[in-house]
Amino acid sequence: MAVSWRSWLANEGVKHLCLLIWLSLNVLLFWKTFLLYNQGPEYYYIHQMLGLGLCLSRASASVLNLNCSLILLPMCRTVLAYLRGSQKVPSRRTRRLLDKSKTLHITCGVTICIFSGVHVAAHLVNALNFSVNYSEDFLELNAARYQNEDPRKLLFTTIPGLTGVCMVVVLFLMVTASTYAIRVSNYDIFWYTHNLFFVFYMLLLLHVSGGLLKYQTNVDTHPPGCISLNQTSSQNMSIPDYVSEHFHGSLPRGFSKLEDRYQKTLVKICLEEPKFQAHFPQTWIWISGPLCLYCAERLYRCIRSNKPVTIISVINHPSDVMELRMIKENFKARPGQYIILHCPSVSALENHPFTLTMCPTETKATFGVHFKVVGDWTERFRDLLLPPSSQDSEILPFIHSRNYPKLYIDGPFGSPFEESLNYEVSLCVAGGIGVTPFASILNTLLDDWKPYKLRRLYFIWVCRDIQSFQWFADLLCVLHNKFWQENRPDFVNIQLYLSQTDGIQKIIGEKYHTLNSRLFIGRPRWKLLFDEIAKCNRGKTVGVFCCGPSSISKTLHSLSNRNNSYGTKFEYNKESFS
């Protein structure tokens, strides 16, 4: 499959450029720090004691400082949402780069794990060398109290050692709970362990306050490796002068040859004993800015979300899909954004993100979400919203006497689908419940499509059975009829694909005549679909938006980079629930 460099640069170029910059920063920081501790005169004596372990531990620490600061930035969701909607970021390419924030977070996390391993291994070697190479001449340098002290004591009786062990434990818990299997099977574990990040950062700030590694402060008056002489005031002395002053008898055997060889060599003389000082901690310089920004945002989000919403109605759709309609004072959101729901009656600490399927407008303040009942949290939430006797009913209208649980929302936050209205042509592909991000887009078009750039929308929905799309079919029919009445039949191209055929004719034939010709059995032929779109939109840029299984996502991503003979460029965007 031939690759279109134009599409590849649009989809991958900026991402790979940022990756290259990030990689260069890590390599440069590692190498510069390694050379400093390997060749720096102020680290001469500590390097003599610890060797390569010193260089590796400090170089890896510098990389950890960088990534521990960067990993917090993608988690500042309110800041990212502001930047996405701000006129200060007019470039669509720059806004699309914000969609890679999750990738940056994961990349920095993996890097932290790798270099934490290097850092720990290097310090284990350092602990051994501190014990074995105990210095009688420079007692200030020693971390051990005596020679051949058990290195394990350094790990469990010093602040850097003890905090380091605790950080390794916390990091291990966070990493193992972040695996895909645990996130899918038990999201609670992932959520609770990931909030240990605050403990990790507090330990990190304590970790660097121990001051075990020390550098020399008087390099000018005590050059590294100098010879300490009594009753001399000369800093530099040639070997013959040194010999004539200190050897009055016959020269040591073989010294004449040594004199000839080093005739011009200068021996550095110490004017005073070396002085050592612990490093001023630099980690806080790296992480204080991002950490303060993140904490300030969390405080702002806490204040913003402290007032519960008013639940207007709860709708129980087929296929275990629930719809929740709410109102909150001064709540504003853009199509494609998502919110985080928090129900204390379900879980005191747990929150879950849900894409808005209905956004508030100037004429109506109602907004809503759809969610599929899968997992412990959604099951408990459903049971609180619907009494057991009413869970089989289709619609529960708002009843004043109904005691809904208190529900808090945080957000809204940005997502890639905000850009779907900013293309002239958009291709939206959904798989199963992945259709929810597009619901708000279609509802917005139903209200008023004229303020937006979008003039043609291809909507593809792949479902397992007919019940999966029943709750969404009414909106599709209304939207289709709207554009037909406005004499714009080509504005929305709807294609629905089902893998099971049971009961299709009965349901479709009776209720959704409009969708008869747009319903297909089997899977889409993606290559033919892309060719058709490219042919109908020659020379244009098409936004491709996908929310669904990874198999569909990978196929669309590959086809978006494929070359076509019509000069059409496909820009790929993806949303993921995991």
UniProtKB/Swiss-Prot annotation:
Summarize tissue expression.
Answer: EXpressed in brain, in all layers of the cerebellum, in pyramidal cells of the Ammon horn and in Purkinje cells (at protein level). Expressed in osteoclasts, leukocytes, kidney, liver and lung.
| Extracellular compartment segments | 38-62, 126-154, 210-424
Where does it localize?
A: Cytoplasm; Endoplasmic reticulum membrane; Cell membrane; Cell junction, Focal adhesion
Q: Which cofactor does it need?
A: heme
Query: What is the topology of this protein in the membrane according to its UniProt annotation?
Result: Multi-pass membrane protein
Q: Please give the name of this protein.
A: NADPH oxidase 4
The molecular function GO annotations come to: heme binding; modified amino acid binding; NAD(P)H oxidase H2O2-forming activity; NADPH oxidase H202-forming activity; protein tyrosine kinase binding; superoxide-generating NAD(P)H oxidase activity; superoxide-generating NADPH oxidase activity
What's the source species for this entry?
Answer: Mus musculus (Mouse)
Q: Which regions face the Cytoplasmic side of the membrane?
A: 1-16, 84-104, 176-188, 446-578
